[in-house]
Amino acid sequence: MMTMDAADSRVVRAPQSPRTTLAALGLVLVFLAGLAVVPRVFAFHQGSLVGRDVPEFSLSLVANGAAIGGDGARVTMGQLRGRAVLLDFWATWCPPCRAEAPIVDKISRRWSDRGVVVIGVDTDTADQGDPREFAIAHGLTYPIVQDLSGAASRSYAIESIPTLVVVSRTGKVVAVRTGITDDAEIERLLQQALD
């Protein structure tokens, strides 16, 4: 049996060269620079939609579709021309999306009589959550379409969720917001879309 005395059990550090320290510091700086640049790249990409014609899509209504054709009907952006539109790209598994859903529902209820249509665009794949169950569980009343193929998300340059896209009556993108957006900001953007 082997025994170890206290002097032998101490931790010995390998000597570090200044090169190693500088390399580690360099990696940290590159990482921090990346954190600063990546959001700007995404914002630029999405911001490039602002002022342009809204990308077209044709997606199936999966929940709360009575007001615009009934569940199972196809919804296109062309059908909605003449009305301001708030598109909410989200997924059932996304905690920030769950937090924003009641805000979007409140906006839908407040603005529906002013010519605004709110549409939730579920980005779940077929093996993820059920948007109908999500709508029921969260008391959502606005129409929800499903983007199973991801084509709509790609055409709108959706890189993260939740993302809101505000569209004017003339079919131009007014704003794109990623992350939880408060109701005052959404209402300000919708007013812009109606003006």
Regions found by a protein language model. Give the residues of each.
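A short beta-strand-turn-helix
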Residues: F57-V85, S108
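Structural microenvironment flanking redox-active thiols in thiol-disulfide oxidoreductases
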Residues: R98-H138, L148-S155, R188
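Active-site acidic short loop of glycosyltransferases
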Residues: L80-R83, D113, L140-T141, I158
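Short pre-active-site segment immediately N-terminal to redox-active cysteine/selenocysteine motifs
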Residues: R83-V85, F89-W93, S160
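Thiol/disulfide oxidoreductase modules built on the thioredoxin-like
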Residues: E133-T141, Q146-A193
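N-terminal targeting signals for export/organelle localization
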Residues: M1-A66, D195
